[in-house]
Amino acid sequence: TYNPTGSSTGIQAAIDGTCDIGLSSRALKDEEKATLTETIVALDGIAIIVNPANPVSDLSVEQIAQIYTGEITNWKDVGGDDLEISRIGREAGSGTRDGFETITDTKEACKYNQELTSTGDVITTVAGNPNAIGYASLSAVKDSVKALTVGGVAPSEETVLDGTYTIQRPFVLATRTGEALSEAAQAFFDFATSADANEIIAAAGAVPVAK
């Protein structure tokens, strides 16, 4: 059975032995690697999104960090209109938020105007607010928002896989090191890490890594 409780909860369940495989949308931390083995099955770009009415089309990672930490507060400072920036993000414990804050080096420093509990809510909020900036899994981005290029690189399957789009995170299977999985769990693990799963992973919008 699959229980979607968030990355940190899934990792802790794997550590505690209350599940066979913990699923995470962030890399394991060093202390978690003390008891768990990390297997990357896919990559996901985290798109930086704005309202389609926003004339800004590109930001650097540094500018994104400065916006989210409150150092830059007006769109005019990055080539946009004279409007106060509304910073939209995910709730604490979200793998997307963890990935975004890790890559932009803004952990514990982000000043969010709104912290929302789902990617869909972030997209809807940004779509309805011309001042807003948000982040969302590339696979979830809709035409109702505009995904920015980051350092001149557009988020796509190709740029995520070749590493030129830098705001990306891994999807991880976390298993207890040195412990055998049950027959059913091992069968799932073998399938998920094989090229046979690539079509399913791609259909879900992530970038498969198995050859």
Where are these regions (language model features)?
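Exported/periplasmic ABC-transporter solute-binding proteins
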Residues: 1-211
